[in-house]
């Protein structure tokens, strides 16, 4: 939450309006500069510093570093998302090599098109693509951590956690308006990860990671 507020403060100082459609951000040139500066710089390095303080050897990366993640700019359809990337290639061997060396990659939600341009990329997509790539080398559990205890039936009731959800239930909840906004791409990424060999996906609060709480996606 501090990260999101921090980014919002930068938007305001720069006179930039943040626009979202269906839980996905519209990224113009000015927005891309801010996202790259904040998420590729300040936020990423603060996370790395925090992990180092805990004795965890972490390395902060964007998709451009060592050609980790290549994307294509999303084509204009009903909505023009601007400088947003759809991931096309992940350097799975690089990620696996870092982990084998005891290095924890900290990935910013930024990719590149291999033509010299950075692209804003949904953070859940980054996590999902990394998990899918690593599933070729390891047994992977993908965990999405955010401010809620899991996927909620009632967004105003933090205790209304849906313990398990499959594709059929997901589609029904979306149609009924129970699941909306940013939770939709989060769950879409979850199902794609499972299809690609990820063992399981858990959506929960960071504080509940080791408690077995949250929503299991299968």
Question: Where are the regions that the model predicts?
Answer:
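Residue-level preference for the first positions of well-ordered beta-strands
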Residues: 102-106, 141, 200
């Amino acid at each position: 939450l501090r990260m999101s507020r921090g980014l919002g403060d930068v938007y305001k100082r720069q006179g930039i309006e943040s626009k979202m459609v269906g839980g996905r951000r519209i990224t113009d040139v000015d927005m891309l500069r801010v996202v790259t500066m904040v998420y590729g710089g300040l936020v990423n390095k603060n996370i790395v510093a925090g992990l180092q303080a805990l004795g965890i050897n972490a390395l902060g990366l964007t998709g451009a570093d060592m050609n980790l993640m290549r994307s294509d700019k999303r084509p204009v359809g009903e909505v023009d998302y601007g400088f947003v990337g759809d991931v096309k290639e992940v350097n799975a061997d690089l990620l696996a090599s870092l982990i084998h060396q005891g290095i924890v990659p900290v990935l910013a939600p930024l990719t590149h098109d291999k033509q010299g341009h950075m692209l804003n990329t949904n953070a859940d997509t980054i996590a999902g693509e990394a998990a899918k790539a690593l599933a070729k080398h390891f047994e992977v559990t993908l965990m999405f951590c955010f401010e809620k205890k899991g996927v909620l039936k009632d967004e105003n009731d933090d205790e209304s956690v849906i313990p398990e959800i499959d594709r059929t239930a997901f589609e029904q909840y979306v149609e009924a308006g129970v699941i909306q906004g940013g939770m939709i791409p989060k769950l879409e990424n979850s199902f794609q990860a499972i299809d690609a060999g990820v063992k399981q996906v858990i959506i929960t609060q960071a504080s509940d990671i080791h408690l077995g709480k949250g929503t299991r996606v299968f």
